[in-house]
Amino acid sequence: MANFTSILDEASGPVPYQLTNDYLFRTVMQKNQTVLKGFVSALLHISEEEIRSLEIMNPIVLGEDLDSKEFILDLKILLNSNQAINIEVQVLNYDDWPERSLTYLCRAFDSLKHGDDYIDVLPTHHISILKFTLFPQHPEFYSTNMLMNVRNHQLYTGKFQLSVLDLNKIHLATEEDKKYQLDYWAALFVAKTWEDFKMIAEKSEPLKEAAKTVYAVSAEEDIRLRCEARRRYEEDRAFLITSGRKQGIKEGKSIGFQEGEAKLSSLITLLMEQNRLDDVKRVTSDLAYRRELYEKYNL
């Protein structure tokens, strides 16, 4: 560890926030191009030399309060001026992630302007970084999904991709994943101590830069405050989702268990995406208001 940069020499003990905190993730990727390039290289399984340019298309003003448009902290990237990448970190399981991620992908894919030719639509790749297993019956560390013919496996198009990185399944990383150190990047996301960060950071320069940047921004009060706000927000969401599921079970007694739970879960997700936490709390306890919103949103 003697050759390790001095910025982390005195760091020890628990980290204040893990990289699964989406504000911290967004800050680190936006602050350090070396980290962003290394991470994208690992996710796409391509060499860093193949990455000629990376542009964040939805930058935020770091350290300032988020407005409603920025509340969902997905990272939109333009790779080499000809490929759109959307990366999102998600800790909570909404039970609707396939539909939700597909919606995000479709929005990003719809990049044509009036008068553009359809052939010019950018290849688009949505990458979900999850702290839960999407398909427990088919666990994978990193999976990529595309449109193809179910009989002969002919690709319909290579311009439409969905990938999922499961932070709970690092032990299932393939040799290809390990070749691009995606397993170490995943380990960095779930590292709980500075000692863990230092050990992982020795594996490559981008990982070292990531550890340095996490340490540096964690010392900035305005960044810490917003990381804490996001942590509390996620805790509130977890509580509200649990409450909503319990209410959904009650409704399910009369309209069918799965239908009742799914209906309320969809409403809660919709309200959370609009940052309407007060309304989320209300719908879990106010049946009349809940039915009013069901009708309003055709649920």
Model-derived features: where do they sit?
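Elongated, amphipathic alpha-helical interaction scaffolds
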Residues: 1-299
